[in-house]
Regions:
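C-terminal catalytic domain of photolyase/cryptochrome flavoproteins
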Residues: 1-184
Length: 184
């Protein structure tokens, strides 16, 4: 939605968005996008509550429950990811958009963070710190909570994230002409 920079700066409240979208959703019950947005706003608040509950534990490699995690500090792999030189066009397109704008949609953020932490096995905190330095909508709670979730060390891990199924991701990717244009 690109509300995130406004939310991060306090110019717009999540409550206001929630109430407006809820009203729209009630008037247009078939709108799936409204339901998704409502869910994302609730998830945002969940991450805030969990971040304040667990506080500094979110910054540990093993996250809030101090899980054992296989990861490496591979700065060459990190640079490959940052410079959009991975083997995957979808990841590269998202990273190029991020480098050029300081913003990335939520699905892209989920995929690139999971790719770095699960496919490349790079310490998720390094990716989170990179995002912290680049995001135009940076929010400490949301950034670290989202990264921890995708690395499998957050609070909401009923299902352990695994490496991304890149063929399935690529199939979705090639349906979006915007990403193909970014790669040209």
């Amino acid at each position: 939605t690109k509300f995130s920079p406004w939310l991060a700066q306090g110019c717009l409240s999540a409550r206001y968005i929630y109430l407006q979208v809820l009203q729209y959703s009630n008037e247009n019950p078939d709108c799936k996008g409204a339901k998704t947005l409502l869910t994302n706003i609730l998830l945002r608040d969940f991450f805030y509550v969990m971040f304040f509950k667990h506080n500094i534990k979110y910054f540990r490699q093993g996250g809030v429950f101090n899980k054992k995690l296989i990861c490496i500090k591979d700065f060459e792999a990190l640079q490959t990811w940052i410079s959009a030189q991975t083997e995957d066009d979808y990841i590269n397109a998202n990273m190029l958009e991020f480098a050029n704008t300081g913003w990335m949609n939520s699905i892209g953020r989920q995929h690139v963070s999971q790719y770095l932490s699960k496919n490349m096995l790079v310490d998720w905190r390094i990716g989170a710190a990179y995002f912290e330095s680049q995001l135009i909508d940076y929010d400490v709670c949301l950034n670290y909570a989202n990264w921890a979730e995708k690395a499998g060390v957050g609070c909401n891990n009923a299902i352990e994230p695994t490496s991304l199924n890149m063929p399935a991701i690529k199939e979705q990717f090639y349906n979006y002409s915007d990403f193909r244009a970014i790669l040209k």
